[in-house]
């Protein structure tokens, strides 16, 4: 038992007691107990700070049947157990004499007392445990991009971007530097280590990079990042969206995800004797992701809109290949200054994904490659966007699913990724995504009206 988990006389772990002390010290009057549903939507219940000790010792009960994809009404009682390591003051709720804070929770099944199999955070924990059983610790660093849009006089989002800036632009083209600065202040106050921020390629598109962490903390950070960005953008009368492709014919928003494995404190992905500084373990992990990419796409690119981003010409990957330099490939090996920084970058996830499920799917896919000792194809250094079908066949390069329906088909054919998610999550996720795609197929878009209404 670690020092943090040693129980105090009051039945609290030392870590939980430290949170109670901080609540009193910082005049926290309300706590948000947060978790995510299967689709990645953040849910929360607010409790008075006076109930914090009870939350740690007994948990907080809620109706799981009211959460999409959780349980049926006849088995609805669920329990939230807060993770004390996730305690953070909400910067946009801090006042002179009071504050609100957040704790991320694990979800438990009250009938069995076991972790709920439909809890996305639990799904990722199982992936991490599998890696640990193989002797690996996982580090990850995502890069979620987002757009800022103007709000109308009623506070509703418009499709007017906040500026006309481009990649790395400065003011006056970049009108969001103050917004990004305030977002960074908020993130840093919640424990983020920020590396850089900048305007992205498209008008109104932005990126704020934070440092890598262990896989669970990284997924927690993505969920937190999205909440902070939206809340602080709203203070500037702007609407922040992580929709992958809100504007046609410009770059969409991705969430490039850097991953590395460590073993006995050393980077298991590094081999200085290799041409690409990649170990055999790294290549096998890469091969696993490439093999399972069609199924992983359903989880990492989970919306109809995701596939409007995954098209040639806008710096988003379409073809299943890897490269040591080429950004048109699905997976890239970024340059690393030190052996500890050796990693791979999965370029296909987007920020609409559930970060817990997406990371779990990537991890299981990669570990499957290691367990089966898969051979990794040679890297492709040419621009794959310029390949014709014959040349892609020559290189053995397959294409990602063209839409959400095809991605879900791939998921239903891939037992490794189904096992990664677990039976409950797979069933509920597929059901939700089939319904979403069906709704999309019968919807009549503005494009169709413009194209056909006066033509026929």
From Swiss-Prot:
Q: Output the InterPro entries linked to this UniProt entry.
A: Gln_synt_N, Gln_synt_N_sf, Gln_synth/guanido_kin_cat_dom, Gln_synth_cat_dom, Gln_synth_gly_rich_site, Gln_synth_I, Gln_synth_N_conserv_site
Question: Start and end of every GS catalytic domain?
Answer: 120-456
What PROSITE patterns has UniProt attached to this entry? GLNA_1, GLNA_ATP, GS_BETA_GRASP, GS_CATALYTIC
Subcellular location per UniProt equals: Cytoplasm
Summarize what activates or inhibits it: 12-fold increase in the presence of 2-oxoglutarate. Up to 18-fold increase in the presence of 2-oxoglutarate and GlnK1 or GlnK2. Inhibited by AMP and glutamine.
Residue sites binding Mg(2+) 1 per the record: 143, 256, 345
Per the annotation, which location comes first and is thus the protein's main one? cytoplasm
For this chain's record, the cofactor binding note is:
Binds 2 Mg(2+) ions per subunit.
Please name the Gene3D superfamilies in this protein's record: Glutamine synthetase, N-terminal domain, Glutamine synthetase/guanido kinase, catalytic domain
Question: What is the role of the protein in this entry?
Answer: Probably involved in nitrogen metabolism via ammonium assimilation. Catalyzes the ATP-dependent biosynthesis of glutamine from glutamate and ammonia.
**Oligomeric and partner information:** Homododecamer. Interacts with the nitrogen regulatory proteins GlnK1 and GlnK2 in the presence of 2-oxoglutarate.
Q: What is this protein called?
A: Glutamine synthetase 3
Q: Which species expresses this protein natively?
A: Haloferax mediterranei (strain ATCC 33500 / DSM 1411 / JCM 8866 / NBRC 14739 / NCIMB 2177 / R-4) (Halobacterium mediterranei)
| Encoding gene, per UniProt annotation | glnA3
């Amino acid at each position: 038992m670690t020092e943090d988990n040693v129980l105090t006389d009051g039945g609290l772990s030392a870590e939980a007691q430290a949170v109670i002390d901080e609540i009193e010290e910082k005049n926290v009057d309300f706590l948000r107990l947060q978790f995510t549903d299967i689709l990645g939507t953040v849910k929360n219940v607010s409790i008075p700070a006076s109930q914090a000790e009870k939350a740690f010792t007994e948990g907080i009960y809620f109706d799981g049947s009211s959460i999409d994809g959780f349980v049926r009404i006849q088995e609805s009682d669920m329990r939230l157990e807060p993770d004390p390591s996730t305690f953070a003051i909400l910067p946009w709720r801090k006042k002179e004499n009071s504050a609100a804070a957040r704790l991320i929770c694990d979800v438990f099944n009250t009938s069995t007392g076991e972790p709920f199999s439909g809890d996305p955070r639990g799904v990722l924990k199982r992936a991490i445990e599998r890696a640990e059983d193989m002797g690996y610790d996982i580090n990850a660093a995502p890069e979620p991009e987002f757009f800022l849009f103007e709000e109308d006089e009623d506070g509703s989002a418009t499709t007017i971007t906040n500026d006309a800036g481009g990649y790395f632009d400065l003011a006056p083209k970049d009108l969001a530097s103050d917004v990004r600065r305030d977002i960074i202040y908020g993130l840093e106050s919640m424990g983020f280590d920020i590396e850089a921020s900048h305007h992205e390629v498209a008008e109104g598109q932005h990126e704020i990079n934070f440092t890598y962490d262990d896989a669970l903390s990284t997924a927690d950070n993505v969920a937190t990042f999205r909440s902070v960005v939206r809340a602080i953008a709203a203070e500037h009368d702007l609407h922040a969206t992580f929709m992958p492709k809100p504007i046609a014919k410009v770059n969409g928003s991705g969430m490039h995800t850097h991953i590395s494995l460590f073993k006995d404190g050393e980077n298991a992905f590094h081999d200085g004797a290799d041409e690409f500084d990649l170990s055999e373990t790294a290549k096998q992990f890469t091969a696993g992701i490439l093999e399972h990419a069609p199924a992983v796409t359903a989880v990492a690119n989970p919306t109809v809109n995701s596939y409007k981003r995954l098209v040639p010409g806008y710096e988003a990957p379409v073809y299943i290949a890897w490269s040591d330099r080429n950004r048109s490939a699905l997976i890239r090996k970024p340059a690393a200054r030190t052996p500890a920084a050796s990693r791979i970058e999965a370029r296909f996830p987007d920020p609409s994904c559930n970060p817990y499920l997406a990371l779990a799917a990537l991890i299981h896919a990669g570990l499957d490659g290691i367990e089966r000792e898969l051979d990794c194809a040679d890297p492709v250094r040419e621009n794959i966007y310029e390949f014709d079908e014959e040349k892609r066949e020559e290189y053995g390069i397959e294409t990602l699913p063209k839409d959400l329906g095809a991605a879900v088909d791939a998921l239903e054919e891939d037992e490794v990724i189904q096992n990664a998610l677990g039976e409950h999550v797979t069933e509920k996720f597929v059901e939700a995504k089939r319904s979403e795609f069906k709704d999309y197929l019968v919807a009549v878009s503005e494009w169709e009206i413009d194209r056909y209404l006066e033509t026929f």
